[in-house]
From Swiss-Prot:
Gene3D superfamilies: Metalloproteases ('zincins'), catalytic domain. This is Endoribonuclease YbeY. Binds 1 zinc ion. GO terms for cellular component: cytoplasm. The keyword Hydrolase applies. Belongs to the endoribonuclease YbeY family. Its cofactor is Zn(2+). It comes from Agathobacter rectalis (strain ATCC 33656 / DSM 3377 / JCM 17463 / KCTC 5835 / VPI 0990). It holds the Pfam family YbeY. Keywords: Cytoplasm, Endonuclease, Hydrolase, Metal-binding, Nuclease, Ribosome biogenesis, rRNA processing, Zinc. Its EC number is 3.1.-.-. GO terms for biological process: rRNA processing. It is found in: Cytoplasm.
Amino acid sequence: MSFFIEKEVECNFNFDYEKVAEAVVSASLEHENFPYEAEVNLTLTDNEGIHAINKEYRQIDRPTDVLSFPMLSYETPGDFSFLSDENEDDFNPDTGEVMLGDIIISVDKVKEQAVEYGHSEKREFAFLITHSMLHLFGYDHMEADEAAVMEEHQRKILDALGITR
């Protein structure tokens, strides 16, 4: 697995955010039984940075906690059967890894929401990465049944890591 973190801002967390991020990405890949080596990019920004991206790509004029930019298109969430070694577009030509996509997190929102929801910054950070990884696997939460499936996957991944509220 290749996992890259780009810091656009200082990350003054009281935990090893790089270690937590990598553990969450690995646990998500394992939970979904992802059949290939994967490449994931994480950008850590602030409310101003994520606001600009949210406005540009989603036409939503406000900051958000996390944005996900999947590189793959799924017919069924979590079904990787469409991936094939013959389809070179899905693989990084230098590493041979499947390019899953990009995760962008507002460090400001991690801190704000941890206080708002009454849990640790570590839990909020891990939750947002888990949530975004599921989007990179094709899951969504536009409908109630989709949201329930996503919430169950999130809970199982975080429980496996011992990261709870």
